[in-house]
Amino acid sequence: MHFDWSDFIWTLINFFVLLFILKILLYKPVLKTIEDRKKSIEESLEKAAKAQEEAERIKAEYDGMIAKAREEAREIIAKAQKTAQAEKEEIIATAQREAQSLLADAKATIAQEKEKALRELRQEIGNLAVLAAGKILNRAVTLEDHQKLVDEFLNEVKM
C-alpha cells in the first residue's frame, strides 16, 4: 500500500474548498434563515403575550361592566319594588278613606231617613190620636184644635 501525498493534498484542498463553498452557500443562509425564524417566533410570542394581556384586560373590563350592570339592575328592581309598595299603600289608604267617607255618608243618610221617618210617624200618630179623640168626643175637631192636640201629644212623646 502506497500512500500518495499529492492525492491526499488534493483531497484536502477539495475538502476545504467544498467546506468553504458549503459555508458560503449553505451554512450562512441556513444560519440566517434559522436566526430569522427564531426572531419571527420570538416576535410572534411577544405579540401573542401582548394579545393575551389585552384580552385579559378587556375581559376584566367587561366583567366589571357586567357586574356594574347587574348592580344597576338590582337597584332598579329594588327601586321599582319600593315604588310599587308605596303606590300600593297609597291606593289602600285612598280606598280606606273613600270607604270611611262612604260609610259616614251612609250613616248620615240613615240618620236623616230615620229622623224623617220618626217625624212622619209622630205626625201620623198625632193625626190618629186627634181622630180617635174626636170620635170619643163625638164632635168635629177644628183645624185649630187639631194642631193644638198634635203639638201637646208630640211634646208628651218627646219627654
From Swiss-Prot:
One of its GO terms (cellular component) is plasma membrane. The keyword tRNA-binding does not apply. Keywords: ATP synthesis, Cell membrane, CF(0), Hydrogen ion transport, Ion transport, Membrane, Transmembrane, Transmembrane helix, Transport. It is a single-pass membrane protein. The chain crosses the membrane at residues 7-27. It holds the Pfam family ATP-synt_B. It is found in: Cell membrane. InterPro entries: ATP_synth_B-like_membr_sf, ATP_synth_b/b'su_bac/chlpt, ATP_synth_F0_bsu_bac, ATP_synthase_B_chain. Its main location: membrane. GO terms for molecular function: proton-transporting ATP synthase activity, rotational mechanism; proton-transporting ATPase activity, rotational mechanism. Gene3D superfamilies: 6.10.250.1580. F-type ATPases have 2 components, F(1) - the catalytic core - and F(0) - the membrane proton channel. F(1) has five subunits: alpha(3), beta(3), gamma(1), delta(1), epsilon(1). F(0) has three main subunits: a(1), b(2) and c(10-14). The alpha and beta chains form an alternating ring which encloses part of the gamma chain. F(1) is attached to F(0) by a central stalk formed by the gamma and epsilon chains, while a peripheral stalk is formed by the delta and b chains. Belongs to the ATPase B chain family. F(1)F(0) ATP synthase produces ATP from ADP in the presence of a proton or sodium gradient. F-type ATPases consist of two structural domains, F(1) containing the extramembraneous catalytic core and F(0) containing the membrane proton channel, linked together by a central stalk and a peripheral stalk. During catalysis, ATP synthesis in the catalytic domain of F(1) is coupled via a rotary mechanism of the central stalk subunits to proton translocation. Component of the F(0) channel, it forms part of the peripheral stalk, linking F(1) to F(0). This is ATP synthase subunit b. The lineage of its organism: Bacteria, Bacillati, Bacillota, Clostridia, Thermoanaerobacterales.
